[in-house]
């Protein structure tokens, strides 16, 4: 297991405790993704399921069980870089202009991978379109990844 500082462990424990609604030192398995996101990770539901598939869906887990899940998600997601996402979107940039249509990006975000709702897409794309209805996908990726 990665060596975390006392401050990091205290931060992880504090976030974990916020999801412990019974005060028994455990959280619902269904809350693991939310807890990870509260700690700055951005796992997909698929990522969370891969790390928790051996646990029962209605199970409550302790911090000691949560910590290795956090580590696995942290390690797995650290490989995703802005350049990887930009490269993926570049395939949809037919004229190599640095732009893709907002309609095409909206379609990608609502149908592929971790599907977003229309409301989530609207929030992400707010103020990103130019007058022609296109989006600079490099700016978009950097904005999304910067939080």
UniProtKB/Swiss-Prot annotation:
One of its GO terms (molecular function) is calcium ion binding. Keywords: Calcium, Metal-binding, Motor protein, Myosin, Phosphoprotein, Repeat. It comes from the Eukaryota. Ca(2+) binds at residues 93, 95, 97, 99, 104. One of its GO terms (biological process) is actin filament-based movement. The keyword Metal-binding applies. InterPro entries: CALM/Myosin/TropC-like (IPR050230), EF-hand-dom_pair (IPR011992), EF_Hand_1_Ca_BS (IPR018247), EF_hand_dom (IPR002048). Disulfide bonds: none annotated. GO terms for cellular component: cytosol; myosin II complex; myosin V complex; myosin VI complex; myosin VII complex. Coiled coil: none annotated. Residues 7-42, 80-115, 115-147 form the EF-hand domain. The modification Phosphoserine is found at residue 30. The keyword Metal-binding applies. Myosin is a hexamer of 2 heavy chains and 4 light chains. PANTHER family: FI08416P-RELATED, MYOSIN LIGHT CHAIN 1, 3. This is Myosin-2 essential light chain. It comes from Drosophila melanogaster (Fruit fly).
């Amino acid at each position: 297991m990665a060596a975390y500082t006392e401050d990091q462990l205290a931060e992880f424990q504090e976030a974990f405790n916020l999801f412990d609604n019974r005060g028994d030192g455990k959280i619902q398995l269904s809350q693991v993704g939310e807890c990870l996101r509260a700690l700055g990770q951005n796992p997909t539901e698929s990522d969370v399921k891969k790390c928790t598939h051996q646990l029962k869906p209605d199970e409550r887990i302790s911090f000691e069980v949560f910590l290795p899940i956090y580590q696995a998600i942290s390690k797995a997601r650290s490989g995703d870089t802005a350049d990887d996402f930009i490269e993926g979107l570049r395939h949809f940039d037919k004229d190599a202009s640095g732009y893709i249509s907002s309609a095409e990006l909206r379609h990608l975000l609502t149908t592929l991978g971790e599907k977003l709702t229309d409301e989530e897409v609207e929030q992400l794309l707010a103020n990103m379109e130019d007058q022609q209805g296109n989006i600079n996908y490099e700016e978009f990726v950097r904005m999304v990844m910067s939080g």
